């Protein structure tokens, strides 16, 4: 036991009102109790720096008779291992009632002693306890800022600056749709024009809404009264009955007559075009989208119009050469293109196919060459196959002009003017000889 000359800050003073106990059962200031004799480590921030020894509880045999204390051992430093147990009687501690104290009026010890942890058992102290230093009570550090008188587990949100209620931004939370006057606010009115009649944030107090004030949405078609809404649109779609996931609220924010209601938003697409002015380009695009039936049909019509020679740009019309054939509207940019086109109108076809049995004539040489490639160079067609015109054949010779065998092979040494022998009398071998 240390001497009683220690500094007053090295001792933990516990005052207990012992009017119903004898002097032998009540521990007091003269019992020599000191927290420095406790075997359980306690936070050093609770005591002064006068001693580096671990404080401990006084192991007195009848200390637990007056106010029952529960002692626990723990190896974790800076943790509280004691608590006040069974504070259910009407006895007073330090002159304050503890047993009749409500749970919300109790404040955990970590709010007074920063060395304690919230996870350990807490020593509850009344919240009304003055947070000033007294020499004969718990010494502690500087006082902490006062909290609001509310439950400790209440989530306190600081009051914001001026704000608008939810019903101001959500039209579905305004008054019922058929209780407003008939006239509407002009569409040009903005939120800045409505701020002068809106109440300030000091006058916006929370309101409790009773279930009787809640008016649910109608389950059937909405039929407005003829006396209230004479200009109500007649093409409003029927509302579908539904069950909302959240309860409906009807909040009154003191909107004056002429305020915009959800009914004024029901007239459809035209009202939104009035409220939000569309750009000319966007409006024209929307009109074209409604006029055009489909993209495919519009593309076909565009291609047909482009194929017409009358729809050519004027810059090309100035330099083109027009066909002089009656009834022909052909125009060309170059002279040689016009000459080639004029041959299609002439009856002269100097280019004739040389293949025996064909004798097809063309007015242009390129058309004749295309005829050779597409008609006589392929097997299995109804036209005669010519091996000299097939690039894949070993007899390929585009300059050959002469007689051909029945299978299309050339007869070298023959001429086109020669008569072909009868196929029944001569064989292919005889032709080769």
From Swiss-Prot:
<keyword id="KW-0805">Transcription regulation</keyword>
<keyword id="KW-0677">Repeat</keyword>
<feature type="region of interest" description="Disordered">
    <location>
        <begin position="238"/>
        <end position="270"/>
    </location>
</feature>
<dbReference type="GO" id="GO:0008270">
    <property type="term" value="F:zinc ion binding"/>
</dbReference>
<feature type="region of interest" description="Disordered">
    <location>
        <begin position="391"/>
        <end position="416"/>
    </location>
</feature>
<dbReference type="GO" id="GO:0000981">
    <property type="term" value="F:DNA-binding transcription factor activity, RNA polymerase II-specific"/>
</dbReference>
<dbReference type="GO" id="GO:0005634">
    <property type="term" value="C:nucleus"/>
</dbReference>
<feature type="zinc finger region" description="C2H2-type 1">
    <location>
        <begin position="321"/>
        <end position="345"/>
    </location>
</feature>
<keyword id="KW-0749">Sporulation</keyword>
<dbReference type="GO" id="GO:0000785">
    <property type="term" value="C:chromatin"/>
</dbReference>
<keyword id="KW-0010">Activator</keyword>
<dbReference type="GO" id="GO:0000978">
    <property type="term" value="F:RNA polymerase II cis-regulatory region sequence-specific DNA binding"/>
</dbReference>
<feature type="compositionally biased region" description="Polar residues">
    <location>
        <begin position="238"/>
        <end position="264"/>
    </location>
</feature>
<dbReference type="GO" id="GO:0048315">
    <property type="term" value="P:conidium formation"/>
</dbReference>
<feature type="compositionally biased region" description="Polar residues">
    <location>
        <begin position="23"/>
        <end position="33"/>
    </location>
</feature>
<keyword id="KW-0862">Zinc</keyword>
<comment type="function">
    <text>BrlA, abaA and wetA are pivotal regulators of conidiophore development and conidium maturation. They act individually and together to regulate their own expression and that of numerous other sporulation-specific genes. Binds promoters of target genes at brlA response elements (BREs) containing the conserved sequence 5'-(C/A)(A/G)AGGG(G/A)-3'.</text>
</comment>
<protein>
    <recommendedName>
        <fullName>C2H2 type master regulator of conidiophore development brlA</fullName>
    </recommendedName>
</protein>
<keyword id="KW-0479">Metal-binding</keyword>
<keyword id="KW-0539">Nucleus</keyword>
<feature type="zinc finger region" description="C2H2-type 2">
    <location>
        <begin position="351"/>
        <end position="376"/>
    </location>
</feature>
<keyword id="KW-0863">Zinc-finger</keyword>
<dbReference type="Pfam" id="PF00096">
    <property type="entry name" value="zf-C2H2"/>
</dbReference>
<feature type="region of interest" description="Disordered">
    <location>
        <begin position="23"/>
        <end position="65"/>
    </location>
</feature>
<dbReference type="GO" id="GO:0005667">
    <property type="term" value="C:transcription regulator complex"/>
</dbReference>
<dbReference type="GO" id="GO:0030435">
    <property type="term" value="P:sporulation resulting in formation of a cellular spore"/>
</dbReference>
<dbReference type="InterPro" id="IPR036236">
    <property type="entry name" value="Znf_C2H2_sf"/>
</dbReference>
<keyword id="KW-0804">Transcription</keyword>
<feature type="compositionally biased region" description="Low complexity">
    <location>
        <begin position="34"/>
        <end position="48"/>
    </location>
</feature>
<keyword id="KW-0183">Conidiation</keyword>
<keyword id="KW-0238">DNA-binding</keyword>
<dbReference type="InterPro" id="IPR013087">
    <property type="entry name" value="Znf_C2H2_type"/>
</dbReference>
């Amino acid at each position: 036991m240390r001497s009683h000359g220690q500094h007053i800050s090295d001792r933990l003073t516990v005052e207990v009102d012992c009017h119903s106990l004898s002097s032998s059962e009540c521990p007091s200031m003269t019992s020599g109790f000191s927290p420095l004799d406790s075997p359980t480590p306690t936070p050093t921030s609770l005591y002064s720096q006068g001693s580096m020894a671990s404080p401990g509880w006084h192991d007195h045999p009848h200390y637990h008779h007056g106010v029952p204390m529960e002692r626990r051992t723990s190896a974790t430093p800076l943790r509280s291992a004691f608590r006040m147990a069974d504070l259910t009687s009407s006895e007073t501690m330090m002159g304050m009632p503890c047993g009749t104290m409500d749970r919300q009026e109790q404040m955990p010890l970590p709010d007074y002693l920063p060395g304690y942890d919230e996870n350990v058992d807490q020593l509850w102290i009344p919240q009304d306890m003055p947070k000033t230093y007294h020499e004969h009570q718990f010494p502690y550090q500087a006082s902490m800022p006062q909290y609001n008188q509310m439950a400790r587990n209440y989530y306190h949100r600081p009051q914001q600056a001026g704000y608008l209620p939810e019903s101001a931004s959500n039209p579905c939370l305004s008054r019922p749709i058929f209780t407003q006057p008939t006239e509407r606010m002009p569409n040009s009115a903005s939120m800045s024009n409505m701020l002068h009649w809106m109440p300030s944030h000091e006058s916006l107090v929370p309101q409790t809404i009773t279930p009787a004030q809640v008016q649910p949405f109608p389950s059937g078609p909405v039929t407005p009264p003829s006396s209230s809404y004479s200009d109500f649109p007649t093409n409003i779609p029927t509302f579908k009955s539904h069950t909302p996931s959240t309860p409906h609220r009807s909040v009154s924010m003191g909107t004056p007559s002429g305020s915009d209601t959800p009914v004024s938003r029901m007239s459809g697409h035209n009202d939104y075009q009035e409220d939000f002015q569309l750009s000319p380009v966007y409006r024209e695009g929307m009109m074209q989208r409604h006029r055009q039936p489909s993209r495919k049909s519009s593309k076909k019509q565009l291609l047909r119009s482009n194929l017409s020679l009358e729809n050519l740009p004027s810059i090309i019309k100035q330099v083109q050469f027009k066909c002089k054939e009656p009834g022909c509207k052909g125009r060309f940019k170059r002279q040689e293109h016009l000459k080639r086109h004029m041959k299609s109108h002439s009856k002269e076809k100097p280019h004739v196919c040389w293949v025996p049995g064909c004798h097809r004539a063309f007015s242009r040489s390129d058309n004749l060459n295309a005829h050779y490639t597409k008609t006589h160079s392929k097997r299995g067609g109804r036209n005669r196959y010519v091996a000299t015109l097939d690039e894949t054949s070993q007899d390929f010779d585009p300059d050959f002009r002469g007689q051909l065998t029945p299978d299309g092979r050339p007869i070298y040494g023959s001429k086109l003017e020669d008569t072909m022998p009868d196929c029944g009398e001569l064989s292919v071998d005889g032709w080769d000889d």
